[in-house]
UniProtKB/Swiss-Prot annotation:
This is UPF0398 protein BLi02355/BL05236. Belongs to the UPF0398 family. Pfam families: YpsA. It comes from Bacillus licheniformis (strain ATCC 14580 / DSM 13 / JCM 2505 / CCUG 7422 / NBRC 12200 / NCIMB 9375 / NCTC 10341 / NRRL NRS-1264 / Gibson 46). PANTHER family: UPF0398 PROTEIN SPR0331, UPF0398 PROTEIN YPSA.
Length: 183
């Protein structure tokens, strides 16, 4: 696997409203654990659309892993221009920092938001270009990542397309493991 698309919940879908929420440590640790395993198998690119939450956190994790895995690259391909326009200043700063540190940035439609079709186009494009999907999602907790997941499941009908899921149970295990090692 060379290219991994990453998506998942937005912060509000997880009840996270602060950039220093303790839960972020565990979410990032779970993302890191999955990415390291894939890096050891040849992962080269992490592909995100720059959405708040899981995607930006995954980019931050990838940047931290670049010390150990210098060939790892991050691409941010947004569904439309100015997606951050209505975000808070703090969220815009995080987004701009990720864009600045990324190896490749582009907008899929080269236009501002027009309709939900742009999100559908982005989901199809990501699944078409990626070799697999890492998704922070739990079937029991509906949310925005379901659209990318459904697109990935369609791809699985036609080709080998692994979906690596981080569920709430996986996060609980991460918390327990981290707590065990802290003791």
């Amino acid at each position: 696997m060379k290219v991994l698309a990453v998506t998942g919940y937005k912060p509000f879908e997880l009840g996270i409203f602060k950039h220093d929420d303790k839960a972020l440590f565990y979410i990032k640790k779970a993302l890191e654990n999955r990415m390291i395993a894939l890096l050891e198998e040849g992962l080269e690119w992490v592909l995100i659309s720059g959405q708040l939450g899981t995607e930006l956190w995954a980019a931050e994790v990838a940047f931290s892993l670049q010390e150990e895995f210098p060939d790892l690259k991050v691409a941010v391909i947004t569904p439309f221009l100015e997606q951050e326009k209505k975000w808070s200043e703090k969220n815009q700063e995080q987004y701009e920092a990720v864009l600045a540190a990324s190896d490749f940035t582009e907008s899929l439609t080269h236009r501002p938001y027009e309709s939900p079709v742009q999100f559908k186009q982005k989901n199809r494009f990501f699944i078409e270009k990626a070799d697999g999907l890492l998704i922070l999602y739990d079937e029991e907790i509906e949310g925005s990542p379901v659209y990318m997941l459904n697109e990935a499941k369609k791809a699985q009908e036609k080709r080998d397309f692994p979906i690596y899921t981080i569920t709430m149970d996986d996060l609980r295990v991460t918390v327990e493991e981290c707590s065990f090692y802290e003791e």
